[in-house]
Amino acid sequence: MEIIARLANLPGALPGACAQGLIWGIMAIGVYLTYRILDVADLTVDGSFGTGGAVCVMCLLSGMNVWAALPVAVLAGLATGLVTGLLHTFMGIPAILAGILTQLALYSINLKIMGKANQSINVDKYGLLISLRWVKEFALHNPIIMVILATAVVIGVLYWFFGTELGCGIRATGSNPAMSRAQGINTNFNIVLGLAVSNALVALSGALLSQYQGFADVGMGRGAIVIGLAAVIIGEAVFSRIFHNFALKLASVSIGAIIYYIVIQLVLTLGFDANLLKLLSASVVAVFLAVPYWKGKYFSKPVKKAKEDAKNA
């Protein structure tokens, strides 16, 4: 009976979970660009997510319009990806280590931007684009509606961009760097550009989350890479058989983030210890990452052996 009583509270919490999932889904799309397209494990996102939130909040507190604050936050995120890309390509530092170095530096930079560990912003005093307060309202300014529109714009722009010659060059760089260089493609430039675009999206997500929750925190991006990977993997696991178009693959990542946050909300509603959420997330990501390896190791060989036996017969 206690479980049923707790589950009765779940519908009231679902709008908030969906809104958060959509916001983090934009960040997950950024992770998808580096993880699946560039084939680079970029850990900058844990820092650039907070940078987007910090820059957006400080711009709003200084009197800047929200429509001007968001592009500034996006440019700040783009700059963080640019730094990681240059550390990797120009200085020869491995991509993972380059991301860690940038992430570490961004902790101090985010502190310097805000002047302290966190900065709050009041929805009554500032014209925010989204807010937690409106999540259950049936109106255009509902965060769910606004972020769906933002996600649609992001997916549309990325679909167009990766269909251009430059975008195809980035995809080719991630798919086969050696062949791309042989075709005269500047792979270093494409890696830097891909990382910059990815972290620009991550910063946009951070800027939206800071408005939604009403504050920016220096540690708000901690564990973002795990959430991003979880969204990518869940989206692929659920929709990979039916979503083959590039735009639909990006949409599946966003839906994966929503599923992730709904599951998290369900687990919390059932009384799971909130202190163990990061452990749960890491375990889920580890298992899903291992599934392709397990499939190849334990399920492919018997099929090949059966085919060989049939040929010999």
What residue spans do the PLM features occupy?
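Alpha-helical transmembrane segments within multi-pass membrane transporters and channels
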Residues: 64-104, 109, 149-152, 255-256, ...
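Cytosolic-side transmembrane-helix boundaries in multi-pass membrane proteins
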Residues: 175-182, 186-189, 248-251, 261-313
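Transmembrane alpha-helical segments in multi-pass inner-membrane proteins
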Residues: 202, 206-278
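Membrane-embedded helix boundary and interhelical linker motif in transport proteins
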Residues: 35-90, 133-140, 242, 269
